[in-house]
Amino acid sequence: MRRLTRRSAIASALALSACGREASSQTVTDTPLKSIATTPVGACVQHAFLQDPAYAELFARHYSQLTPEWEMKMEYILQDDGRFRFDRPDAIADFARRNGIRLYCTTMIWYDQAMPAFLKLDGQGKPFADAYRNYILAVAGRYRGQAVGWDVVNETVADNGTELRQSIWTRNLGVDEHMVLAFHHAKEADPNATLFINDYHLENNPTKRATFMRTVERLLKAGAPIGGIGTQSHLDLDFTRPGMARAAMRDLASFGLPIHVSELDISLGEKPDFARLADLRQRQADLTRELAESYMSLPQQQRFAFTVWGLRDQDSWLRGQSGQRPRDQGLPLDDAGQPKPMFQALAEVLSG
């Protein structure tokens, strides 16, 4: 007789919960994801979304961890005159605290954000370095004791996959040196938070993944207190093939550090055939299952969290921020907050 594992029991429960509906590849359940997942599960939020009680209730129903999508980035916190703005980050942190949700923070240092307060110090040596340290100490220190982790360095590898990005940080502090400093400053500010280096297209682009891994090796040898590896996992049906996620997880886990699937979504592609939406959603579910199974195959101490990049399809950057795919549907919950096949794949696999 086959042993009834937790995962098989959950799968059976999911199937039973769908009785009475039309049987299809799109049969899903509305069971709270966090109630059955054996790893922290999260999504990103924006302050404005949390003002909607229905949104806030749905988020708290399904997720045990949150990441502020925008308001903890430097472009929000650091004003032009050098003052800090913490109103919205504090409100998001308070929502997490009130609802027993883990707070994960992003992002400390990002090539894309050269704010006027730092541009004024460009090329000035010690004043620039002091401002860099003071910013990290102030921001990471503010959420000390609540934040479980930080994306300390974000998206350091260029899109060509072979080079590191150049920025105001590399120009003033050094290509590797600015990252080493950022990790040390963050560790000083919050010794108990897990400190991550985070990047995207690590599944789709093996060359970029290799460059990323060499960078991590150098930083570790230089003494950077890197505590974890973040893979954003912005996947795409046009480019992500079966096996890619599994290979990436195997490589990234080789450091022995905790892994955070930090920003999962799966785009339908540039020109999806919506007449075949059921098939497209099943392909999303298959990729989700592969990624989740690869993650769950890691030792427990390496499974930091599994995060999706948005609560509902209507909240996704794939539609709004990019503006190029207004009908994209890359998340486990649809526009109305109803589960899709991606959700069922997560529920079955993350149950352990």
Predicted segments with their positions:
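N-terminal secretory signal peptides and thylakoid transit peptides that target proteins
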Residues: 1-17
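C-terminal segment of N-terminal export signals and the immediately downstream linker at the start
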Residues: 20-44
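Acidic-and-aromatic substrate-binding clefts and catalytic sites of carbohydrate-active enzymes
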Residues: 44-53, 74-87, 157-159, 202-211, ...
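Short, acidic/polar
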Residues: 48-60, 132-136, 208-218
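Substrate-binding cleft and catalytic face of glycoside hydrolase catalytic domains
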Residues: 67-71, 90-172, 176-194, 200-202, ...
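Aromatic-rich peripheral "rim/lid" segments of glycoside hydrolase catalytic domains that contact
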Residues: 151, 155-161, 165-172, 185, ...
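Noncatalytic carbohydrate-binding groove/subsite architecture in carbohydrate-active enzymes
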Residues: 172-258, 262-270
